[in-house]
Amino acid sequence: MELSELIEVTRVRDAFMRKGPRPAQVGDICIFGHHLIFAPTTVGKEVPDNAEEFWLLHKAVDRVLCEPISKENPQRGGLLALKCKNFLLIIFEIGDLEICRATARTIESLSNINGFLHDYAFFYNSPFTILDDGWSAFDLEQEFARLMLSTDAFRISSVNENFAICPTYPEKLIVPKGIGDDYLKISATFREGGRFPVLSYFHKETKSPLVRCSQPLIGPTNRRCREDETILNSMITVNRGYIIDTRSKSSATAAKAKGGGAEPQGNYRQWRYIQCPIPRQREIHDALTRMVDVCSERKVTSDRWVSRVGQAGWLSSVAASLEAAANVAQCIYNERLEEVPVVIHGGDGLDSTLIASSLAQILLDADARTIRGFESVIEREWICGGHPFSLRNNHCAYAEGTVTGPFESPVFLVFLDAVHQMIAQYPMSFEFDENFLIFLFEHAYASEFGSFLGNCEKEKKDNGIRKKTVSLWSHVHHPENMKQFVNVCYDPTPGVIWPSIAPQCIKIWDRLFFRWQRPDNSWSTPETETIQSLADHWKLREKELIAKASSLRRSVVELSRELRVLSPM
């Protein structure tokens, strides 16, 4: 199929475009295979002050609406509304109603093509020189080499070569060293989707591994798999481990009736079972829809608006994700215990499991709070970890796909919002700022890069994505691009961070939900030099206070000595 076959209208002249509260512009709409381009009309050689050429990927459009300006007088033309996946609302006023409808049909068709083989990423030519190829930036062998500096308890297994055991896992995985591939194959038959236990993270300080997998298929008959038990028990050295289930008790019970379930205590005696529920896919999807609706509401009282924000359920989903991650981190980072293995799973291990495992790493590891370290977490846990981006992100808050509707959910956005909450509470502990998170959100839904294409590594390999497209990380790693994401106040915080999950501490992400409702300059931030100056001032002030505290401690010690000398025996 050629994309040109779907284009009924290639150009619409003299259309009015409105983007949120920004002033309307007059110009031409040009439609190509992958983009809609709005070119403002010039008057003679003069360009209006508010003129802005606007490019929009069709893939970024979530919903298309078309209606006449006046039902009583169709000759006045039509209104074309494009609701985008990044919550931008664009309205075009077109003088001819039939042309407006044809334009709507064209954009509707181009934005809802099944699959991803016609996506722009396959046709994009990078305008910059790739200095650091993102496709090879996070190699498993390199990760394993770093791991070997801390422990020799794991090995690389090629048991999933050609994706023979698990289609959603990569071909190479890090597994416990004393376990043979035959045990892994048997364990795969006992875990949902073949997702047997694999290493996700190793905490150097406490020597505690974080392992993820999917639910065990015990079913109503309490099926048992001794090989799976052996894999988990092989990680027990000194202390009992933890199995953390990201489902609610009712969900785990319902799953057992359908063939799934949770690890029975009688078979996994060296493990403590903990439930840290994160909302399910559908709940997250509906919560975002309600949240976006609330944030676009204008005619409502403050009390009613606050109530609706709470009822939307989005902030509670983010808080639940942070709470689950904090529980994982607490199990791993225990000052009294070392070598405490933690296994985490939900149902299929593709959504809430990845939220908890990746957030826990950011809490525990300062390296994960750098740009490159954060990318590594996303690459390992989400992209290689098998999160089905193409299914989950086919639509966002405004629409549902005819085929993919039941599978769509902004799970990755929950993760990004949770990281945003961490940045809000620890603004100097992250090398990147919220601009980077919004950038990742937008590219996860529509992008000229191939990183988020497909649902797993198998689909990437089958469709040649790594060979035919440019990695998003290649773009980020270019010095000219990276500087826009750097937090100038960054001051590395070693060790663990513990963000509060109290309701009053979980904030609405203004830059995400409200940025299109304000004029362009309302989100302007102080100049970099000003921010840097403030950061330097407070760093200097911190050093002064630390020095003063040390001096006071020395004075206390000296006074204590004098007191002992002067005090009678």
Curated annotation (Swiss-Prot):
The keyword Membrane appears for this protein: yes
GO process annotations (BP): endocytosis; negative regulation of autophagy; phosphatidylinositol dephosphorylation; pinocytosis; regulation of cell migration; synapse assembly
Highest taxon in the source lineage: Eukaryota
Alphabetical UniProt keywords: Cytoplasm, Endocytosis, Membrane
Keyword Membrane: yes
Known role: May act as a regulatory subunit for mtm-6. In association with phosphatase mtm-6, plays a role in endosome trafficking probably by regulating phosphatidylinositol-3-phosphate levels. Regulates fluid phase endocytosis in coelomocytes. Regulates posterior migration of QL neuroblast descendants and the anterior migration of QR neuroblast descendants and HSN neurons during larval development probably by controlling Wnt ligand secretion through the regulation of sorting receptor mig-14 trafficking. Involved in the formation of correct synapse number in DA9 motor neurons.
Name of the featured protein: Myotubularin-related protein 9
Species of origin: Caenorhabditis elegans
